[in-house]
Amino acid sequence: MSDIKKVVLAYSGGLDTSVILKWLQDNYDAEVVTFTADIGQGEELEPARKKALQLGIKQDNIFIEDLREEFVRDFVFPMFRANTIYEGEYLLGTSIARPLIAKRQIEIARATGAQAVSHGATGKGNDQVRFELGYYALEPGIKVIAPWREWDLLSREKLLAYAEKAGIPIEMKHKQGGAPYSMDANLLHISFEGRHLEDPKAEAEADMWRWTVSPEQAPDQAEYIDIEYEHGDPVAINGKRLSAAEMLTELNRLGGKHGIGRLDLVENRYVGMKSRGCYETPGGTIMLKAHRGIESITLDREVAHLKDDLMARYASLIYNGYWWSPERRAIQVLIDHTQEKVNGWVRVKLYKGSVSVVARDSKETLFDKTIATFDDDGGAYNQADAGGFIKLNALRMRIAENARRQRG
């Protein structure tokens, strides 16, 4: 422990990371640097600064940064270019936030001369893996302190007792039993875990959802919006250009208004267990559908199918914490190359929990009406050619069947 003189802590200002802050001071006798990232969680972050100061952190060692634009531009959008979904449903809202936080912790560690970084992820979850794989990928010699794998404060009662003894300010909600769920939010989504959600037989309570109205209570009138794309990224809604963070914020508002993006999921964690989580991803759900819509007329068939084949692997890499790995970067290069001609607009219909593409157009379109039409195409497509095409593709199956018959 003696070689760790300074440590950069991913700090939210909440109970857990405040206890970790004090625990690091007590057990490592190290100078603590706090890093708090605004990635759109919707919380006031200045209380984190105030609490850090109360716990003895120097003003120069408190870093609070607005990373919303970087988060959406450099992490969310690249992921959505691949139409990324984990296990058929999950849009990876928590997973994609960890690489950015890890990156900034390492950058701050370099700038401040810290020998170690620390996080508040538990020893049961995926986040410990995501954070630490990022740390080691970006700074191979960094030391990592994961308190939940070291200390004996394994219950809320023990955490509260430690906090009271250490003089850590405790919010009333924690004294009254804590929040009803473990929640994590950023501009892409909000997640809910724990408490009665740990029983997969129990339906989530109606008042749990924060960002979306119930689809049953959504407006009776459908809403149509046009989303413009450039190189696979959304850049404008109804003709109004928006920054990356503004785009996702507005899509969240629209999706939430129409009850879009709710998900109740049992997923397979990288650490081996199954875990239930509920998610609200209104803007991301719209983006996924719209992006597939513009790709449908701009991507070559085999390129589109190759992307689909790679997507599951790409999703697992992000979910499991390998954003900074060479294989994820390699896939990203290919994905980004496919998006060069993904330009145009998509019209989507938002209605009572559903989003559907109803129109799309692009100067780069590969849709040729003269060939695709059911009417007379003037010779653009010779239907007689299909006979030879079919026979050649049936040849191997005909050979196999003839061989079977000869064998009796």
Swiss-Prot record:
The main location class comes to cytoplasm
Quaternary structure, per UniProt, is: Homotetramer.
* Places the protein is found: Cytoplasm
Which gene holds the coding sequence for this protein?
A: argG
Q: Which GO terms describe its biological process?
A: argininosuccinate metabolic process; L-arginine biosynthetic process; urea cycle
Annotated positions binding L-citrulline: 90, 95, 126, 130, 182, 191, 267, 279
Q: Which HAMAP family match?
A: Arg_succ_synth_type1
The residues that the entry says bind L-aspartate are 122, 126-127
Which species does this protein come from? Paraburkholderia phytofirmans (strain DSM 17436 / LMG 22146 / PsJN)
Q: Which PANTHER family match?
A: ARGININOSUCCINATE SYNTHASE
CDD domains given for it? ASS
Q: Which GO terms describe its cellular component?
A: cytoplasm
The entry's family comment says:
Belongs to the argininosuccinate synthase family. Type 1 subfamily.
Q: Which GO terms describe its molecular function?
A: argininosuccinate synthase activity; ATP binding
- Which pathway does UniProt place it in? Amino-acid biosynthesis; L-arginine biosynthesis; L-arginine from L-ornithine and carbamoyl phosphate: step 2/3
Keyword list, A-Z: Amino-acid biosynthesis, Arginine biosynthesis, ATP-binding, Cytoplasm, Ligase, Nucleotide-binding
Catalytic reaction annotation: L-citrulline + L-aspartate + ATP = 2-(N(omega)-L-arginino)succinate + AMP + diphosphate + H(+)
Q: Which residues does ATP bind?
A: 10-18, 37, 120
Broadest EC class?
ligase
Q: What's the protein here called?
A: Argininosuccinate synthase
